[in-house]
């Protein structure tokens, strides 16, 4: 999980979702997991 000020999709499988007011990137590649904070 990477915590970044600005999150971006790294590949076509990445999805940006909002969970409890926090933007997250979920992907089949676990290295692409990100959280905005």
UniProtKB/Swiss-Prot annotation:
SUPFAM superfamilies for the chain: Ribosomal protein L36
GO cellular component: cytoplasm; ribonucleoprotein complex; ribosome
Protein name from the UniProt record: Large ribosomal subunit protein bL36
A GO molecular function held by the record: structural constituent of ribosome
BP GO terms, sorted: translation
InterPro entries: Ribosomal_bL36, Ribosomal_bL36_sp
Entry coiled-coil feature ranges: none
NCBIfam families: rpmJ_bact
Keyword tags: Ribonucleoprotein, Ribosomal protein
Family: Belongs to the bacterial ribosomal protein bL36 family.
Record Pfam families: Ribosomal_L36
């Amino acid at each position: 999980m990477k915590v970044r000020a600005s999150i971006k999709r790294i590949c076509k499988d990445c999805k940006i979702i909002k969970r409890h007011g926090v933007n997250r990137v979920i992907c089949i590649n676990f290295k692409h997991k990100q959280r905005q904070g």
